């Protein structure tokens, strides 16, 4: 009876509290996740949305008085920036650590992947031959055959910085610099626009191949982004690079518990909630990402295959090599 009473008091103390999330994810579907967590636990979710850099500056300004419990963002590089400032604490939940392999967790287990995405190729099948895409890789985009045919966004984009960092980790800085210089020479235009703009350029005949994150094609095919993007998405095909070798570059959406979290127990519960099978299934069906748990992906993404060879480079390397990647991209004239 005493043990039961202690448990009830513990649960009630959790219910009485809240969890405060700083997020740079911009998915409307996340709001439904927050509400589901509240419905399931009784814990109120307070959300502050913004750009990753602005939220990081806010955390630094707030210091020990910060109300934030969790930092939720996209790209391992952004999580690394928060960790570099000493703003995370190690995740102690065995439930979380047992579900996420070490290459998808940060140093010291200070952050974890919640979902995955791959940086893939989108091509126009009317302008790219089957021979050209056979055994295609990131490295092969340096070949002369791609001169004036490739579009990709700017070098100040974190997704590209992390891709280059992963290539440095795999191939070394010197070889990656040679590759990046050739890639710049093969671009169809000066980098401009977001990932979807690259896919649109291929669909519209401005280029033959785009490098972009996988989930964008799901968003476009869903029709939620409008008829123009839906029609464009139907004109292109997606392919995973490096399937005969090291595998396609994989990055993450991820989260960590902040060092000065006033509600660390609730924060741990929230991470466990995000990695539960039911939530993983619902989340990736709406965000078009790939799950951490072994659950079904969205119908839109399943059209391109449910399994692919993933590069197993630890995502923590993307942050560690970020400064090197930025300098390299600058040296080769990647605008």
Task: Please place each PLM-identified region on the residue numbering.
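Bacterial N-terminal signal peptides
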Residues: 2-12
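Early extracytoplasmic/lumenal segment of secretory-pathway proteins
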Residues: 16-81
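Extracytoplasmic ligand-binding site segments that recognize negatively charged/polar headgroups
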Residues: 24, 28-31, 67-206, 220-221
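Short, hydrophobic alpha-helical packing/hinge segments within bilobed ligand-binding/sensory domains
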Residues: 55-56, 79, 138, 198-199, ...
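A ligand-binding cleft/hinge motif common to bilobed small-molecule-binding domains
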Residues: 77-81, 209-233
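Periplasmic-binding protein-like
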Residues: 117, 179-184, 189-193, 230-259
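Mature extracytoplasmic/periplasmic domains
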Residues: 253-313
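Extracellular/periplasmic bilobal clamshell ligand-binding domains
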Residues: 299-335
């Amino acid at each position: 009876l005493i043990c039961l009473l202690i448990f009830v008091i513990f649960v009630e103390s959790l219910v009485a509290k809240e969890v405060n999330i700083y997020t740079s994810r911009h998915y409307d579907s996340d709001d439904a996740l927050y509400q589901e967590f509240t419905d399931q636990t009784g814990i109120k979710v307070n959300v502050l949305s913004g750009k990753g850099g602005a939220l990081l500056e806010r955390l630094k300004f707030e210091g020990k008085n910060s109300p934030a419990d969790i930092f939720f963002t996209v790209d391992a590089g952004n999580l690394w920036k928060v960790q570099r400032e000493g703003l995370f604490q190690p995740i102690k939940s065995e439930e979380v650590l047992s579900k996420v392999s070490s290459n998808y967790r940060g140093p010291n287990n200070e952050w974890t992947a919640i979902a995955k995405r791959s940086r893939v190729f989108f091509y126009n099948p009317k302008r790219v031959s089957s021979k050209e895409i056979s055994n295609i890789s990131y490295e092969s985009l340096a070949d002369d055959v791609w001169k004036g045919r490739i579009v990709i966004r700017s070098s100040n984009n974190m997704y590209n910085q992390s891709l280059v960092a992963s290539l440095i980790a795999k191939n070394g800085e010197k070889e990656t610099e040679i590759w990046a210089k050739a890639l710049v020479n093969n671009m169809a235009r000066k980098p401009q626009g977001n990932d979807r703009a690259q896919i649109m350029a291929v669909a519209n005949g401005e280029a033959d191949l785009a490098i972009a994150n996988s989930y964008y094609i799901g968003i476009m095919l869903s029709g939620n982004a409008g008829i123009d993007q839906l029609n464009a998405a139907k004109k292109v095909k997606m392919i995973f690079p490096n399937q005969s070798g090291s595998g396609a570059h994989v990055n993450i959406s991820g989260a960590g518990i902040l060092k000065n979290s006033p509600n660390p127990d609730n924060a741990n519960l929230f991470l466990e909630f995000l990695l539960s099978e039911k939530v993983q299934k619902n989340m990736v069906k709406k965000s078009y990402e790939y799950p951490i748990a072994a659950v079904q992906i969205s119908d839109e993404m399943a059209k391109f295959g449910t399994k692919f060879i993933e590069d197993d480079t630890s995502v923590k390397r993307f942050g560690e090599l970020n400064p090197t990647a930025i300098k390299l991209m600058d040296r080769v004239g990647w605008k």
